[in-house]
Amino acid sequence: MPVRQLPEQVINRIAAGEVVERPASVVKELVENAIDAGASRIDIFTDGGGRRKIAITDDGGGMTAADLALAVERHATSKLDDEDLLQIRTLGFRGEALPSIGSVARLSITTRHKSEPHAWGITVDCGDKSQIVPAALNQGTRVEVADLFHATPARLKFLKTDRTEAEAIREVVRRLAMARPDIAFTVAGEERAPVTWAAALPGAPGQLTRLGDILGTDFRSHAIAVRSERDHVAVEGFAAAPALTRANALGQYLFVNGRPVRDKLILGAVRAAYADYLPRDRHPVVALFVTLDPREVDANVHPAKTEVRFRNAGLVRALIIHALKEGLAREGRRTAANDGGATIAAFRPAFTPPRPSAGPMNWDWQRSPSAPIPRHDDVDSMPPAVSSAAFAEPMQAAFDVGGPRADLRLHEQPAAPDMLDRPLGAARTQIHDTYIVSQTRDGLVIVDQHAAHERIVYERLKTSLAAHGVQRQILLIPDIVELDEATVEALLARTDELAAFGLAVESFGPGAVAVRETPSLLGKINAAGLLRDLAEHMEEWGEALPLERRLMHVAATMACHGSVRAGRRLKPEEMNALLRVMEETPNSGQCNHGRPTYVELKLADVEKLFGRR
């Protein structure tokens, strides 16, 4: 077949295949045009998931008759001149949207510029343009799209259900509305109640108001303001505390110069910033806005303009991580999933009262036997409070190791008044040799002793690594650990990373390694269990994971093995010392795996459980 020039109509339909993927793509292009036109209000109406009808009305600048005639031609735009392609400042710039839509649907445009005595209208039906005629409309533009893809019926087969396509449209509008809280949006149609987002005040308060309207009150109550700036690149926005997470990354909204994007670089930076706070299967909720010189970012790398390319991607990534980490650290205890709401909701009545009966009750409280509650033998000799120095010691010899118990012991030790005013209060008891119950001035706190100490050890390992290196203890007799060949190879390939944390490992013949040094901070540890866990994690990492993240994984695994275990009995002074160190430790609200280290219940919550409120 000889080479030939394609007809203009076929060219437009090919272009439409890149620009108009589904009804949501049409809405995105048209709403972006309205935003670029300076609209303060945009109304969106759809029917049949956008297949039957899409109508978008704005109060922007509108177009003259001459501009309207050019607007439906390919590559005709008012947003770009010969020198602007490398410094794009508008959402749209290619001039492809309207002719592409008009080539696969019935397009109708009515518009009025303030300089015109009346509005003008034009229709485009599968590429066939009508004459421009006078029309009725106030200042602004109304664009209607009917029978989408009726010129290319094969494309209809790839669309989802009306409900799915309608939800995709709403998601597009949500993202655009987040970026412009100063514009009012209304989404109607699909036999659903209209959704309206009123224009908000400028600045961070207005931004948070709009985000709360879209993402819900949970996000607003958990939102943490973040900001970082360097070399004319600014990152700001709001990030949810780790108490609010999702099972996927769909709750991460990213914007570059006001443009909603899906960028793997930014998503990776968000994940890295939350790595110390969330379990691997949970994802944070954030809305981040990156602002930089348009010449430093290329927005012309994707047909749908949903991806960008940064000139200095490393700087953008570093600023995002710094902004999020600084915000999470600044909020301190608020970042923990420690509120008692979910805890209260999980409570159930301990028993169902028996129905009244004619016969006598066969259970007598006074005659019912009861076992005495076991206590520490030395409870009377315990001091009322101790400093956190006991927990600051590297070794954990102060802990009395014991087997798991399912008892509940009460330490009737009066707490110093000032301890009740501390954030985590005064320790009152330990239950199941795993949880510490403390009393505060207005409630109580339940602490997971292993999770709490794990975070403390982890933060100390990180601090030591950043400052002067982790102190080591040389073993008089090296621990010989037998492992399979693959595990040995994985460990020996990372000896430098392990050495950074004070773990000296070397080969000891086939299928074995010798551990000659361990971190002093961990005290006596189960070297075999630690090495097996490290090897398993290393197999997952691969070479793609940055060295910094690999080191943090090593630290987290070591902290888990070097922390006080569940099932270990603690003395009152040890429990109080742990609480005091928690109050001084960054990020102590979560363990290294993202689980909460404590839950706080206010007295009012407890009173609700018993019907006192």
Swiss-Prot record:
Classification via InterPro entries: DNA_mismatch_repair_CS, DNA_mismatch_repair_MutL, DNA_mismatch_S5_2-like, HATPase_C_sf, MutL/Mlh/PMS, MutL/Mlh/Pms-like, MutL_C, MutL_C_dimsub
One GO CC term, this protein: mismatch repair complex
GO biological process, one term: mismatch repair
Superkingdom of this protein's organism: Bacteria
Record-linked Pfam families: DNA_mis_repair, HATPase_c_3, MutL_C
Any coiled-coil regions, as ranges: none
Gene Ontology terms for molecular function: ATP binding; ATP hydrolysis activity; ATP-dependent DNA damage sensor activity; mismatched DNA binding
Keywords, sorted A to Z: DNA damage, DNA repair
Keyword Ribonucleoprotein: no
Family: Belongs to the DNA mismatch repair MutL/HexB family.
Function noted in UniProt: This protein is involved in the repair of mismatches in DNA. It is required for dam-dependent methyl-directed DNA mismatch repair. May act as a 'molecular matchmaker', a protein that promotes the formation of a stable complex between two or more DNA-binding proteins in an ATP-dependent manner without itself being part of a final effector complex.
Protein name: DNA mismatch repair protein MutL
Species of origin: Bradyrhizobium sp. (strain ORS 278)
